[in-house]
Amino acid sequence: MHTNVTSEILRVLDRNLRDDPKFLITGLGVTDPKGVFGTTLGLVERYGDKRVLETPTSENAMTGVGVGLAIAGYRPLMIHQRLDFFILAMDQLVNSAAKWHYMFGGQTAVPLTIRLITGRGWGQGPTHSQNLHSWFAHIPGLKVVMPSFASDAAALLQASIDDPNPVVFIEDRWIHNQQIDVNDERLKETVKLGKAKVCKSGDDITIISSGYMSIESLKAVNYLHAKGIAAELIDLRTIKPLDMKTILTSVRKTKNLLVVDAGNEIASFGKEIIANTLMSIETELQNKPRLVSLPDVPEPTSYGVIGEFRVSAVKIAESAFQTLCVPTPEDLIETLTPLKEDVPDEFFTGPF
């Protein structure tokens, strides 16, 4: 029997509502029959509308309510089905939630978790599919989590909920159908925020990614290994705090670096990793580091264009060969065929 990321997130939310009377869930659509892509299904029926609260379309005001609840001793989890909608609440996040603990000398905690779901798929276009994790990581006082796999998505969410101060949990809905056996021992493991995971070991090149990009990166890494290139894949899991120790340990070994970032290239988190590595590494790299990310343009809506715009396993593998100055195999595209449509798998039926 298998479970997936959707079921694991629902399990975590259910458990916290059951075990902690101070835990609340708020957001647009949390009581909807679709239950935020299935992650809140049945919760309002089990725990009532005073614990699972449908909110008005007023993101800034409702985030202020969430901050106030957290300061008052509750543990609210706010959900936005589109990261883009949360832009309206940046004032409350930046000037209240992120700074409160610091402004009051550490005497007051703000245990607020904000689940932001990125909306790629079915022609969502420029205003429903942005990846703004670099933006959030720039804000002092915030932690930023980006789950990738079914094996630790639930543990990362639980660690975010347990944290005494605000955590932005950025969740790509393309990870929702990632499968794992219900008896897999990894589902029982706890995760510490700020600790990356080496998903596959290698000596030739370090590939660093997070969120859904780790899934595409793993496809590329498996292809590279089949071609005799031992790539090491690091899934960051949290981009703030950033686990530079694990990154540097790997780069010292491989002496080659490729960073994969789901966001736009300019002022990106991927460039932050490259800069930190170059400032910290004691030995010379064999080749200049590379970044695979989005171009400096808004996301297109057209199905005919989106495939080329987004980062894929093909682009990642191609960049790895280029980093190592190795010819790209002729069967690359045939073996790692890019998605022909803007959907991750047959499970994804839209419209959202």
Language-model segments: residues:
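Thiamine diphosphate
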Residues: 1-166, 170, 175, 336-352, ...
